[in-house]
């Protein structure tokens, strides 16, 4: 509670870039709510994702296969909800391609990834669970793929270049961590083999919070 982004702010965003980012943010909030058995919040976030998606000409996503109704009917079934969320993702990707809006895929993905990382960081700050830090550390492996996706469409929207710059800065900060350097020195190790030292991820968590603040500011 209090970590996810308020649905009341959804109407603040108007450009395609802003809407794509915030759709990603709300998608991550929806997933977090579902994982934490917060049914009402999950339904509220799905409704908001759909409303934002409609503004991006993605209304067909939720009409296909009764995704919206299926989600609401299966809130208590974790396996079913996982499948439905994956179906929503797949339908969104297909609709973006059909609409020739491929540049928005990376923007939505970046918004969702940053929000997920932000939530994990906030949970860690409150609870001090080192397993959360490990999960954050391992999820950083995804960042290069997001940056590559955004670069492929950089000329399509003026908002993409500053987002790439922020993510590149985060990547550089991560690469400078002692634990990451240990990975570089030992090619046989992967992310799950290395545990960051206590406090090592704190500056990174702050940077993630700063990027999230920039995203929700629009």
Where are these regions (language model features)?
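A cross-kingdom marker for long, charged
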Residues: 152-218
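Secondary-structure edge/capping motif, primarily at the C-terminal ends of alpha-helices
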Residues: 30-37, 56, 95-99, 120-128, ...
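Short, charged, amphipathic alpha-helical segments
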Residues: 43-48, 68, 107-108, 133-137, ...
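N-terminal Sec/ER secretory leader and immediately downstream segment
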Residues: 1-73
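Immediate post-signal-peptide N-terminus of mature secreted/exported proteins
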Residues: 4-11, 98, 198, 202, ...
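Alpha-helical solenoid scaffolds that mediate protein-protein interactions
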Residues: 49-52, 56, 120, 139, ...
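Extended amphipathic alpha-helical interaction segments
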Residues: 77-160
């Amino acid at each position: 509670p209090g970590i996810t982004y308020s649905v009341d702010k959804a109407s603040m965003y108007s450009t395609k870039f802003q809407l794509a980012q915030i759709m990603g943010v709300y998608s991550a909030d929806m997933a977090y709510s579902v994982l934490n058995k917060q049914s009402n919040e999950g339904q509220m976030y799905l409704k908001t994702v759909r409303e934002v998606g409609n503004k991006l000409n993605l209304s067909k996503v939720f009409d296909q296969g009764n995704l919206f109704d299926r989600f609401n009917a299966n809130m208590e079934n974790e396996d079913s909800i996982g499948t439905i969320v994956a179906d929503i993702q797949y339908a969104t990707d297909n609709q973006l391609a059909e609409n020739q809006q491929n540049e928005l895929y990376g923007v939505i993905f970046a918004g969702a990834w940053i929000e997920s990382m932000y939530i994990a960081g906030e949970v860690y700050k409150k609870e001090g669970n080192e397993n959360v830090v490990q999960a954050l550390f391992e999820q950083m492996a995804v960042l290069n793929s997001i940056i590559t996706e955004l670069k492929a469409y950089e000329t399509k929207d003026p908002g993409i270049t500053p987002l790439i710059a922020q993510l590149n800065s985060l990547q550089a900060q991560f690469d400078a961590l002692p634990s990451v350097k240990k990975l570089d020195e030992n090619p046989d190790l992967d992310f799950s083999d290395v545990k960051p030292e206590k406090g090592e991820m704190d500056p990174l968590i702050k940077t993630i919070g700063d990027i999230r603040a920039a995203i929700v500011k629009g």
